[in-house]
Amino acid sequence: MSSFDKLHIKSKTVLAPPSAAATPYRFDTRANLRQEMEERKQRFEDKKEVRGHMAEVLKKLVSNVAFFDNTHIFTPHHDVPDDSSLRLIVLAPEQFYLRTESRLAFDGVLDHVRNHGAKSRYHSNRLIFLAPDHGVLTQLRDCIRIALAWNSIVEDVRTMRLVLDNLQTQQAKEELQATEDVLQRVAQECYKWLLCPVQNNPTVAKLTVDVFPLNTSGATLESEIEQVCINNELVITAWSPIHLREELKKRYWKDNKPAFGAKAFWDDMLRYIYLPRLKNRSVLEQAIVKGASSRDFFGTAYVYHDKKFDGFKLCDANVQLDDTLLLIEPDIAKAYEAAHSLVTPSAEPTPPGSSPSGSTPRTFHGSVAINASTAKIGMVQVAEEIIAVLAA
C-alpha cells in the first residue's frame, strides 16, 4: 500500500462522521477547534449580531447604576420618555467620542435633548449621556465576535450539530466563559466618556456639551458615574438654601413680583438646562424646608391677592412643596412681617380720644400708599421708619 493510501485511510478514520447519514465531524486537535472559532467569527456583522450582543453586555454593565431613575441602551429619542425622571442614555456605537472628532457624539446628545419624536422635548434637563471611545470600539467589536463564535460552537455541540470529544467540549465552554469575562472589562473601558449638555447663558439658545472621562481601571462603573456626577455638580443630591435664594434672586424675584411659586420653579429646573440639575424633587423640598426655618433666605405663603399674603410665614419650617407654595424675597418678607405685626387690632379697643387709666397705648393703626412699580423699595422704607419710631 502506498504512503498516500495509508494517509487517506487515517484521515478518514479521524474525521469520519459517526454515521453515514450524519453531517457533524469530529475535530482531532485543539488547533482545529481554534480555527473553527476564527472562521465562525467572520460570520457576524457589526450592525446586526455584534450590535445586538453589545447592547446585552452594556445592559448588564449599567444594570447596577441605581443613581439614575432609568437607563436606556441605544434608544432613539422618540422612545425616551419626556418626564421628570433622571435618565442615563447610553449612545449607540456609531455615536462614538474622539477628542479630535466629537461631532457624532455631540449630535447624539443634542438630538435627544431637543427632540422627543416629532415634538420638542420639554424636560430637557433630565438627561446624562454615556459615549464609547473610538479607540477601544474596534477591540470591543472583535471581542464580541469571539464570544459569539464560541457561543455558537457550544450551542452546536449541545444540539448535536457538532460532535466534539469531552476535552474539546470543556475547552469550548471555558473559552466562552473567559471571553465573556473579558468582554465586560473591555465594554467598561470603551464606554468611558460621560457627556452633559450645557447652556451657560439663558439668552443664548446654542447648547454645548461638557465631557468627563471615567476612571475604568479600579472602581465599578456605577460608583464612578455617581462620583463624577456629584463632584462636577452634573447632578445635585443636596442643595443649600443659599443657592436656592441666589437662583430666585437672579432670575425670578423682581420689584413688581417679590414672590415666585416653588412648584413653577421646580418645573423650570426640569426644563431649562441653564438651571441646576437636581437629582429629584426631594432635594428641592429639603432646601425649601431648611431655608424656611431661617429669616435669611425667604418667607413663604400660599396665596397673594389684594397686596396680602395668605398663610404668610417667616422663620417657620412647617411648609410643604405643592402647587400653591410661594417663596417670598427675604427683605419683602421682613417688611411685610413688621408692617402686619403692628396693625393687628387689640382685643378691647378703647374709645377715641381716651386711653385706659394708667396705661400707655400699645396699638397703632395707620395706612400708607405704595407705588406698585416700586413696591419692594417702598415696603422696606416703611418698615425702617416704623422700626426707627419704636426704637426712639
Protein language model regions, located:
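Extended alpha-helical scaffold and adjacent linker segments that couple domains
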Residues: 1-392
